[in-house]
Structures are given as structure tokens and as C-alpha cells.
Swiss-Prot record:
Organism lineage: Bacteria, Pseudomonadati, Myxococcota, Myxococcia, Myxococcales
InterPro entries with a match to the protein in the record: Ribosomal_uL4 (IPR002136), Ribosomal_uL4-like (IPR013005), Ribosomal_uL4_dom_sf (IPR023574)
Superkingdom per UniProt: Bacteria
Gene Ontology CC entries for this record: ribonucleoprotein complex; ribosome
Basic residues composition bias: residue spans: 63-72
One of the record's GO molecular function terms: structural constituent of ribosome
Annotated protein name in UniProt: Large ribosomal subunit protein uL4
Region span, Disordered: 48-97
Gene field: rplD
Amino acid sequence: MAKFDVYDLSKKKVGELDLADAVFAGEVNEHLFYEVVKAKLASDRSGTHAVKNRSLVSGGGKKPWKQKHTGRARQGSTRASQWVGGGKAMGPKPRDYSYDVPKKVRKAALRSALALRSKDQKLVIVQEWKPEGPKTAAAAKVLAALGAKKALVVDDAANLALARSVRNLAGSDFLAVEGLNVYDILRHDALVLTADTAKKLEASLS
């Protein structure tokens, strides 16, 4: 088990938390990051790109001139791809870029991302963070005290006040623990977890 300090919102140590080495202190596998981030970005692509081929371009139904004895190259339509205003040959079509990554790979990559933030000393665990209402200035002050200005804050989805407070901060964001992913961990400088959230991650990733 790895020991982690637990802080209050002013970064005063209030206790320690034992967490599984396999989840928070394992080996960092950067290739797993590549696999899951690539899949995430692929699934985010809209894939709506399209061009008109010769069957979709309007007009061009009539043969421009007779087949023989004109001295010109034979043509069947003024909407063939070699004509100005013609359809595109073999152009892009709408498609779905998403693909599945095995569940074991996704879990291993998430464990590796947590271990990376832990080794870089960019993982901060707070006892709890339950603001009375959405107060962005107060959230900025807390993150500054924790040394985590551009941070990903993770807690229960029900903590709406915290979510709304953090999401107004440039460079910081809030995620529900169920939606935690490698891409968002890596694109933020620090990771802030509540003690309960850390235990939930330990249980789900062990």
C-alpha cells in the first residue's frame, strides 16, 4: 500500500490515506496512453466530411457531343471529374472513426496515468470539497493554495456547486469520478481528488 497525505483546502495536512500500489504507484506505460488517447480523439471526430461525386452533381445528363468524327476526345458527361464543375473522383464520404479499446487496456492506462501524476507529485488529495454554492473566485483561491492552478478536479457528479465553480476557471475542469479518463488527466497539469473519490478509484481499478 502507498501512503498519501490528505489535505484540507488550505493545504494543511489533516491525515494520511493508504491506497493500492497497483492503482496509484505502479509502472507508467506511455504506449497505453497512446492507444487510449488515439481512440478518444478518433471517437470525437464528427466524420461528416463529404463531397459530391458525378452522380450527385446536378446537370450533365446529356452527352456533350457525339462519340465519333469530331476530332475531340470522347466525353459522356460534362459532370465527369475532369471537367470544371464536375463531380469529385473518389472523394471523402461520411464515416464513423470510432473504435473500441479493450476494457483491460483502458483500466491499465488509467492506472498508469494516476501513477504518473503521483510520481510527478501532481496528485493532490483533499479531505472533502463541498462549496455552499458556485463560487469561481473561491475555487481559484483553493487551487492556488493547493499548488494546482491548471487542475482536473474529480468528485461525485452530485457535487454541482464544485463543478460549476471549477468549470469557469481557464485551464481547469471538473469531472465526475465515473467519467475520469486518461486524456483529461494528461491534458491538465495536476489532478485533485477527494479522499472518497480516491477510494472509489482504488475499488474500481484494483
